[in-house]
Amino acid sequence: MNKILKIVASLLLVLVASTFVFAQTSSTLNGTAGTLRDDADNFMDVRYYNEVDFSNFFAWTNLSASSATLGYAKKFDNLYLGTYYNGSLWNGSSSTKTTTSDSTSLSKTVKGTHYFDLLFGFSGMALKFDTYFNTNNSVTESTYSITDNKNSNSVFGLTFGGFSISSEKLNIKPWARVGFSILDQTAYSKVEEKILDSTITTTDKSSNLNLFSVKLAADFESGDKDSFFSVFGLAYTLNTAVGANGIIYESVTGMETTTVEREGLKYNTSIIAPSYRFEYNASENLKLAGRVRVNADITTVCEGNTYITGAKPEEMEALTVLTTTEITSNLGLGMQYKLKPNFAMNVGLYAVLPEFNSTKTVTPVGDSKSTTVTSGVDTSFSSSLRTGFVWDINENCALDAYTNIGLTPSFLDSVLGGSLSLGFKYKK
């Protein structure tokens, strides 16, 4: 039972993670451990798109070993239009052929990840449509068997913001997002025995988990951006699974077919995420920054009842309910120093702090319930050093680069193994 719960929970966690749709990040933001923003971070953000200063258009591209990013924004009188794409353009399909003395197998894999966002700005406010598509399909065909696994994940979201509530010392920027995610997983197999007139067995498993999410957030800004500026953020996210029941398994052996259905799967999670960020202009050439972010996540999962189609029991058995609580946090320290008026070095230190986790399992036993609670602190600590530069080639274009160095004995591998990222901005 616990194993089933963990499997269901892990599938749902994949879906939850995907609802926080990838936000474009500049090499400056990455190089300073998430502390210093620039135009590439702001042009598709409903809170800050108005801070991008250009008269005609703004263009941005970022290339790394794993993905490509393209961004473009333009003003049409009082309308602001921003577009953004990120995808794994160079990671496509692969195939492997294996031959043995009595069989031959061919395996093919097709996978890809793509993000596309569209932002409309008007009268200081903004609407942003975000989409995410991920596929990971694999097929293996051999002399006596076929397996076909298909995994797809789609996310659709709408974010509204841009307006602010100001006072003498405080500026409040509220914003909200609603989203819907679809996770489909199917596994088909066909197996034939290695004898004449053998029995053929086929199985078809499926899992469809849909997640509806609502996020309410606000930034509380104070200070002067020319000296000391700080932002306290607070966000609340509610996720719930809908439409996650139905036929999940079908097996055919010879002339006999078995179909299994599921009912009662439930999933709910609440996330509270406070954060704090500051920027300090220590001198004309030196800027210091820092941030800390905390996530408090409470998730309740019930795996539901399964039964053979046509044999649904009059009374469903009582279900086990798993509730997990996780508190995670990370911090970043950043610095930008101008060596020349048009060239600045970025340095950042990023750290993932120990996390607290607790699991409560309520299992029905006869007419009573058994409750088990386990909790503890994961004392593991990880950190990375980040560095890069910004080169303003002229008043219209700039080159932005960073690399990530894990603070482990194999840090050299992290530099040479694909962590280098190059960005290019142009505005006119």
Regions found by a protein language model. Give the residues of each.
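Flexible, solvent-exposed loop segments that connect beta-strands
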Residues: 91-110, 139-151, 186-207, 242-267, ...
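N-terminal, post-signal peptide beta-strand-biased segments of exported outer-membrane/organellar beta-barrel
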Residues: 19-86
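Transmembrane beta-strands of outer-membrane beta-barrel pores
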Residues: 61-65, 85-91, 131-139, 178-188, ...
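Outer-membrane beta-barrel "beta-signal"
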Residues: 389-393, 397, 403, 414-428
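Detector for outer-membrane/organellar transmembrane beta-barrel domains
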Residues: 213-359
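Repeated loop/turn-to-beta-strand initiation elements of outer-membrane beta-barrel proteins
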Residues: 56-57, 77-82, 124-131, 166-176, ...
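Residues that define the transmembrane beta-barrel architecture of outer-membrane proteins
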Residues: 64-68, 108-116, 148-158, 205-214, ...
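Outer-membrane beta-barrel architecture
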Residues: 69-73, 117-121, 157-164, 215-219, ...
